[in-house]
Every structure is written in structure tokens, then in C-alpha cells.
């Protein structure tokens, strides 16, 4: 995200943090991809708008600024989005994307000029294809003044509806890469789309290479070990120091650093965090996520869409 924002001309990022903020400061540091990083710490959760008000003293006094959700991955052209924001004299500009089923998100209705006219709530019933909020905004400084201080405030339910009523909210239609990686399935899909955009990296051949199966596109980090008879890929992403045991199967999955997949284990369509041990003969159901340096006992059957954290 820092690289994406930096490529669009952003030179400073403010991270609104709460839980585990001290750990995040250590992990992220104060410079990422040439961009300066500052932290605004919430003592209690302040919703989606409250953190903007809290961080006001870290922002410039006159220039518009971007707000983006932390679980969005995209290639939105933020330079052009900012230009349109200024050309239309909007107070807020929201990036929108077209999805087949907007029911998990709610729809954004616009006029022929792209001005936002109405928001429709999330629905449990699948809906026709429509535009949804992409989680990336340009806001003018005047928006900060409209956010009440000292309490949790929602951009989507309190701030934006008022701007829409006053005709001060514009949309920016994005037709490129966009994923909401807050869901395991979307996180996996986003990584796989990026994987297919670049030349995949295969393991270095050794004497027993013909007894291993590595199907492209896949990515293998440094010092990965693939056991005899193991099958990796397609669409497998193995980070550094990952071990895949003899006759194990890893497909359509993301495996983080220093994780071990035991012999004859199967991992499909899942995300396995760093330093996790998957016992021999275990089966990890599609859509699952395991993290927290856990050890899964030998022969364990993990149901599809399971979330197992320490």
C-alpha cells in the first residue's frame, strides 16, 4: 500500500491504530518505500471518521488528503482521482468499483456526472451488478470540521450522507485491480492475480526434481524445501524458509515464512501464517486461515472456512 500511495505522489502516511499499536510501530517503522509513516493512536475505537478528526494535527492545513481502508489492495490512479476532486470542487470524492453482487457492501448510486446521489444498505439477498464503495477517498479539510470529536463516528452513516444531501460528494470510477482482502477468499484471489502478472519463480532443480511436481504459476521463496513426491501449485505462494514434506500437496494457497507442512498433508485454498506447523497427514479445508505460530496435530481434519488463531 505504501508503494502504491507513494507512486501517486503521497509522501506521508498516517496510520490510525488502536489494538497492538506498539507492535505495529516496531514492525512498520517510520519509513516504508520512501514514504514517511506517522502514527495516530486511538485509546478507544473511534469508528471510521473519528480517527480522521483525531489525526487532524498531523495533517496539512489546506491541502486535500486521501483516506484508505487498510484491507484494500488496488491500483487506483490516485493522482487522477485527486485532479478530478479539485476540478469538481467536491468536498469528498469516493472511489467506486463495479461488482457482480453488491449485497455484502451496499450500492453507491450516482448521476450522469458522477455525483453521488444515494447509498443503499447492505443486503442479505444477492443483488444485480452495481457500483460499491472502494474504500478510498479524497477529502477536503472542511470535512474534518464536520466530524464530532470525542466519540466514535461513522464516515459512511454520519459524514457522507450529509455531504450527499448538500451535493458535495463526487465518485471516481475505478475499472482496474481491486480486492477487499479482509476476507480470506479475497486475500487469496488478490495474491493470485498479482502472481499471474509477474514471471513466477520456480525452485532450483536438484537430483530428485523429477519426483517433485511444481505447477506454474507459483512462487517459491528462498530456502524452501520441497519433499520427495510433493505437489506444489498451481497458484501456490511459499515464503522464505517454508518446508513441504514428502508427498504433501499445496495448491491455491499462501504459506508464510518458516512454516512446515508435514508429509502427506494437504493444504488447498487457504492461508497459513508464519511459523505454523501442519502435522503429517492433516487436511486443511478450502478457505481456512491458521496463524499464531500454532501446531496442528498429525492427522487433523480442518473444516473448510475455518479460522484458527492463537
Regions found by a protein language model. Give the residues of each.
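Catalytic-core segments of class I nucleotidyltransferases/pyrophosphorylases
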Residues: 64-66, 73, 79-86, 100-102, ...
